Regions:
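Soluble FAD-dependent oxygen oxidases
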Residues: 2-506
């Protein structure tokens, strides 16, 4: 079960409720993912045997082998939200069957590909419609296309690209699936050069609330196609196939640099000065990282600074481009090497934090000034600590390049003109005390507020944050009204809904 077992889930129910901070949103009274409760449906008892008999895949119920793993969301902050069943779909017909069955009985449901929703929105107390087994990857070098099942993980995609000489921008975390990644935008170390994942979309298939299977492209259901390019997962239907544009690539180079904490201000300042004018073929993630203990959890904190990224060119050229950063302070650890695209992806890979976590993002139109850098450093030094080895920190991703070449309204993804995406994150384990958990949540919220003046009011919808106020404007900006119109057309009854789902236009 990862970091928690069944006893721990039960024993920590109170702490999980504190950590989730969502009251009854995911299964008590109030809004439920995919809930459609008619009076007739409430009188029906779900016929699980009937569902199992109609699936080409498999239905898992409590007590079945594999149920616990299949039912848990990746973010263990929401581990107390357990399904009544998990439909392991083998094909599109299974998706349609599971959806129709859940609607018939008025049972809460959610579709899950990788299960990495930061806000726990791929968890359900009813039926989880799992797309994990629909994970095919087909690369066609002749047509320069990549056809993906909705459950294809980043690691599956990179494995499929190995040796083909083509690439598509995908994410950093190996176990994130294409559905959530692409539907919320999707960025990675190749995005400044190749664009966002959603910008590569050529065609997708969508099962709508009515059970219809739509083939969606710029020529067919163009409004839904537009919405699938960054309008967020779980809003309009269940995507069951994606066709992406592939781009030929030769060798690339990669860098990973680390510094001792005393160099934090100098290094962060140098990176933030460099990237706005750096070639679009170069990417960067710079982080202020802390692990270990803290004043609340006890123990000794370990802090450091890291910068890493990809360059579509040689290591020699990359070394020259990095000179302003290398001269700002001497790294304690340095790697700058030529690699293949797939090798570089493996070297730069990092899992989303294990255990429980909170993440708060914002976009910046310009680099943090010196005062903002000092504020970020001071807050990292105040992290209260936890038992989670993933620790906490503040991260900035260089934006721009190919990402900014499309207009904010050309696709649903609106965040085109920013200079950086900033994310601050805190992690813990559910065995930590309620005091430690609350301190981490307060720390993340405090740091977010302290740096608010430097943001542009926007946030990344794939780093979905249940505590974010005005999330509609932050995630979707000027595209919100059009997204609501698309929702009204394809899901007028609001079947696909959760706490931060796009509502249909009235």
């Amino acid at each position: 079960m990862g970091d928690i077992g069944r006893r721990e889930v039960l024993g920590n129910a109170g702490k999980l409720a504190i950590a989730a901070g969502i009251g009854t949103r995911l299964g008590g009274k109030g809004t439920r993912p995919g809930q459609v409760r008619t009076a007739a449906a409430r009188r029906l008892q779900p016929d699980w045997a009937a569902l199992a008999s109609r699936l080409n895949g498999r239905l898992l119920r409590p007590g079945d082998r594999g149920f616990v793993t299949a039912g848990l969301p990746y973010n263990r902050r929401y581990a107390a939200v357990r399904p009544a069943g998990v439909a392991l779909c083998a094909d599109v017909a299974d998706v349609q069957t599971a959806l129709a069955w859940a609607r018939h009985y008025g049972l809460p449901f959610t579709a899950r590909s990788g299960g990495h929703s930061y806000g726990g929105y791929s968890a359900s107390r009813g039926l989880v419609i799992s797309l994990a087994r629909m994970n095919s990857v087909q690369v066609d070098r002749d047509s320069l296309t990549i056809t993906l099942g909705p459950g294809a993980l980043n690691r599956d995609i990179y494995a499929g690209l190995a040796g083909t000489g083509v690439a598509a921008p995908s994410g950093r975390c190996p176990t994130v699936a294409i559905s959530g990644l692409l539907l919320g935008g999707g960025f990675g170390f190749s995005s400044r050069h190749l664009g966002l994942t959603c910008d590569q979309l050529l065609e997708t298939e969508v099962v709508t609330a009515s059970g219809a299977l739509l083939r969606v492209s710029p020529q067919s259901h163009s409004d839904l196609f537009w919405a699938c390019q960054g309008g967020g997962g779980g809003n309009f239907g269940i995507n069951t196939r994606f066709v992406l544009r592939a781009t030929p690539v030769a060798g690339v180079s990669v860098y990973k640099l680390e510094w001792d904490w005393q160099h934090a201000a100098a290094v962060l300042g140098a990176v933030l000065d460099l990237m706005p004018t750096a070639p679009h073929s170069m990417s960067c993630r710079v982080g202020l990282d802390v692990t270990g203990g803290g004043p609340v959890a006890g123990g000794t904190p370990r802090r450091g600074v890291s910068a890493l990224g990809l360059y579509f060119g040689s290591a020699a050229e990359l070394t020259e481009l990095l000179q302003p950063v290398l001269k700002a302070a001497r790294p304690s650890d340095q790697l700058i090497e030529d690699r293949t695209f797939v090798q570089a992806a493996a070297l730069l890979a990092r899992e989303v934090p294990k255990g429980s976590f909170t993440s708060k993002s914002r976009y910046l139109d310009r680099p943090l000034p010196a005062a903002g850098i000092d504020t970020a450093i001071a807050w990292v030094e105040r992290w209260p600590g936890s038992s989670n080895a993933s620790g906490a920190g503040a991260t900035l991703f260089a934006w721009g390049g190919k990402i900014s070449e499309r207009a904010p309204t050309a696709a649903a993804f609106v965040h085109r003109d920013a200079a950086f995406l900033m994310d601050n994150e805190a992690t813990w384990l559910n065995r930590d005390s309620a005091r430690v958990i609350s301190a981490n949540l307060d720390w993340a919220a405090g740091m977010y507020t302290a740096l608010a003046q430097y943001g542009n009011g926007q946030a990344y919808q794939n780093f979905i944050d249940p505590a974010l106020r005005d999330w509609e404007a932050a995630y979707y900006g000027q595209n919100l009204h059009r997204l609501m119109e698309v929702k009204r057309r394809y899901d007028p009854d609001d079947v696909f809904r959760f706490a931060q789902a796009i509502p249909p236009a009235s």
